[in-house]
Amino acid sequence: MEIKQIAVAGSLESSDMMITISPNDGQGIVLELDSNVEKQFGNHIRALIKTTLARLGVESATIEAVDKGALDCTIQARTIAAVHRAAGVEHYNWKEIDSWNA
């Protein structure tokens, strides 16, 4: 999926995450993470975001993630929403996304 514009999903409320995604002109994935639990869960959060991006077919993007204690399901949901908004996609393929949980 091609990232065409800047998009944001989520909030800075407790137990949430704000994901900002923008085009990166074919330079791969650049991920910046700001989290209160960086030392404990930073590697896991980064891996989860990168896995979600790969499943969506995103090969190039700049992602800024501000974590406020979000659970895995919230991190995935915010990443999916931000990618679809940034790509200009209006319809989700729910069957594909649901198959990730098999």
Curated annotation (Swiss-Prot):
Sequence intervals crossing the membrane: none
Location relative to the cell: Cytoplasm
Modified residues (O-(phosphoribosyl dephospho-coenzyme A)serine): 14
The keyword Cytoplasm is assigned to this record: yes
One annotated Gene Ontology cellular component of this protein: cytoplasm
Entry keyword Phosphoprotein: yes
One Pfam short name: ACP
Signal peptide feature range: none
Keywords: Cytoplasm, Phosphoprotein
Major location (coarse): cytoplasm
Source organism superkingdom: Bacteria
The family this protein is said to belong to: Belongs to the CitD family.
Assembly and interaction partners: Oligomer with a subunit composition of (alpha,beta,gamma)6.
Protein name according to UniProt: Citrate lyase acyl carrier protein
Source organism: Streptococcus equi subsp. zooepidemicus (strain MGCS10565)
Gene name per UniProt: citD
